UniProtKB/Swiss-Prot annotation:
It comes from Drosophila pseudoobscura pseudoobscura (Fruit fly). The keyword Metal-binding does not apply. Residues 1-56, 120-133, 197-220, 308-314 are extracellular. Belongs to the G-protein coupled receptor 1 family. Opsin subfamily. Residues 370-381 have a biased composition (Polar residues). This is Opsin Rh2. Its main location: membrane. Disulfide bonds join C130-C207. The chain crosses the membrane at residues 57-81, 94-119, 134-153, 173-196, 221-248, 284-307, 315-339. Glycans are attached at N27. Opsin Rh2 is the predominant opsin expressed in the dorsal ocelli. Keywords: Chromophore, Disulfide bond, G-protein coupled receptor, Glycoprotein, Membrane, Phosphoprotein, Photoreceptor protein, Receptor, Retinal protein, Sensory transduction, Transducer, Transmembrane, Transmembrane helix, Vision. Some or all of the Ser/Thr residues present in the C-terminal part may be phosphorylated.
Length: 381
């Protein structure tokens, strides 16, 4: 597709009439480049803004390409290692595998489309691909957050409940994954059948749910969607980690107090080494989840700006929010690759050049010496 296929500036005036010149003062608008088949989907609000600087489009395109490569390579390796290694296919790791697969699909379905549109400085793939792009973003984003929610619950069950908890089996893990995907599909298809819709946003290089239309239909969807796909998982994750942190802190305090009474520095047995390993995994999961919310919260705020008619929403703001949200798919393979000893061992066997640092496993059958501190034991886990 050549740039000559892009529409001429009068299209924006034809679409909005006198209001175009009133809002732009005769200057160019982001609607100047919009294709005719996309024009009916564009909210008139965006007509007041000038096109984004071509240099910024190139920067965004390059940034998107970089995170695409990092994410697809990282998540692809995680899927390969966890999926192809029998010893790593535990119930808990199936949730990690599901998360990595979702993140991989997120970037594979979103980033190439964004890069194409950054090149043309508008959406050039038509209404159908607008729906597909936005639906994929919604689907895989929902799967990712609920996968993290289930990971948090698994850590809660292991660390807080301990022997009183019900161990997660392969069957239970598969049922949880099936639930995650069914719920994600439900929220994804709603805008396709009439509850809200998928439309171009900001500088018209990406599509998302309609958060600008002042009608109850799209507003009710956004409120309900954010309740079930953002706030509910956030509450459940915070609940899980509140008790995880409290349990770990109480355990460590009891260990220190008892060690003082016995005039030693550590009381860790082989069982406690396993406990420390579980605590380490909980810290990894908490870090991953925190990074995910740091990536997606700005975009939620952008949607709420449109929902509640708050001034200050610009095309550049929306596209940076949408682009930054994609970085959530980059964090997980990095965090797990650095912090999961068994993952690192298998990765070293299959791809030695991909591993940096030591891959020594903890030795739970030999308890730490009396001179070994609690923090040292935890670092080995």
């Amino acid at each position: 597709m050549e740039r000559s296929l892009l529409p001429e500036p009068p299209l924006a005036m034809a679409l909005l009439g006198p209001r175009f010149e009133a809002q732009t003062g005769g200057n160019r608008s982001v609607l100047d480049n919009v294709l005719p088949d996309m024009a009916p989907l564009v909210n008139p609000y965006w007509s007041r803004f000038a096109p984004m600087d071509p240099t910024m489009s190139k920067i965004l395109g390059l940034f998107t390409l970089v995170i695409l490569i990092i994410s697809c390579c990282g998540n692809g390796v995680v899927v390969y290692i966890f999926g192809g290694t029998k010893s790593l296919r535990t119930p808990a790791n199936l949730l990690v595998l599901n998360l990595a697969f979702s993140d991989f699909c997120m970037m594979a379905s979103q980033s190439p489309v964004m890069i194409i549109n950054f090149y043309y400085e508008t959406w050039v793939l038509g209404p159908l691909w607008c729906d597909i792009y936005a639906a994929c973003g919604s689907l895989f984003g929902c799967v990712s957050i609920w996968s993290m929610c289930m990971i948090a619950f698994d850590r809660y069950n292991v660390i807080v409940k301990g022997i009183n908890g019900t161990p997660m089996t392969i069957k239970t893990s598969i049922m949880k994954i099936a639930f995650i995907w069914m719920m994600a599909v439900f929220w994804t298809i709603m805008p396709l059948i009439g509850w809200s819709s998928y439309v171009p946003e900001g500088n018209l290089t990406a599509c998302s749910i309609d958060y600008m239309t002042r009608q109850w239909n799209p507003r009710s969807y956004l409120i309900t969607y954010s309740l079930f796909v953002y706030y509910t998982p956030l509450f459940m994750i915070c609940y899980s980690y509140w008790f995880i942190i409290a349990t770990v802190a109480a355990h460590e305090k009891a260990m220190r107090d008892q060690a003082k009474k016995m005039n030693v520095k550590s009381l860790r047995s082989s069982e406690d080494c396993d406990k420390s390993a579980e605590n380490k995994l909980a810290k990894v999961a908490l870090t991953t989840i925190s990074l995910w919310f740091m990536a997606w919260t700005p975009y939620l705020i952008i949607c709420y700006f449109g929902l509640f008619k708050i001034d200050g929403l610009t095309p550049l703001t929306t596209i940076w929010g949408a682009t930054f949200a994609k970085t959530s798919a980059v964090y997980n393979p990095i965090v797990y690759g650095i912090s999961h000893p068994k993952y690192r061992l298998v990765l070293k066997e299959k791809c030695p050049m991909c591993v940096c640092g030591s891959t020594d496993e903890p030795k739970p059958d030999a308890p730490p010496s009396d001179t070994e501190t609690t923090s040292e034991a935890e670092s080995k886990a």
